Amino acid sequence: TIDSLFHSSNYVIANLECPVTKIRERVFKRFIFRGEPEWLPTLRRHGITHLNLANNHSIDQGRRGLLDTQEQIKKAGMVPIGAGKNMEEAAEPVLISTSPRHVWAVSSLRLPLENFLYLPQKPCVSQESIDSLIMRVKRLRATDKNCYILLILHWGWEHHFRATPQQREDAHKLIDAGADA
């Protein structure tokens, strides 16, 4: 079962496609999601250790909702990835494991956010350009030569099941820069 697979793993990273907060902020977009904080311990019980927030719905309850979501994830015993008090914090690689090698997660949203004014000094999800991601991967590889670098990219288009030529090209550039997966 998926449950036994997750429990047999030291680390399980999942994409959390909604804010998990009691905060309700008015946002103007087509689909607005929100989950209850009480649901998070269930994810932890089923083996989830890290939750990616660099996606197009983590900001669905505004900036306060995003920050609260990070706190709720921590309270439930998991680690949030890909969001922060500002872009610098949101884009910071997260150390997943130290043994036998360092494993780093680098997360970024690669889609435009609907009706959201992106302000890099305010709470946000990581939303870096490919060139910025390439530089981040190269810097990480240069400082930690024997590590594994996992990229968590939220990209693609709804109901399309194949990568676009541009996504394939970008993926190859990131691999060439030093990303492992």
Which residues are covered by each model-predicted region?
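Acidic, metal/ion-coordinating pockets
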Residues: T1-A181
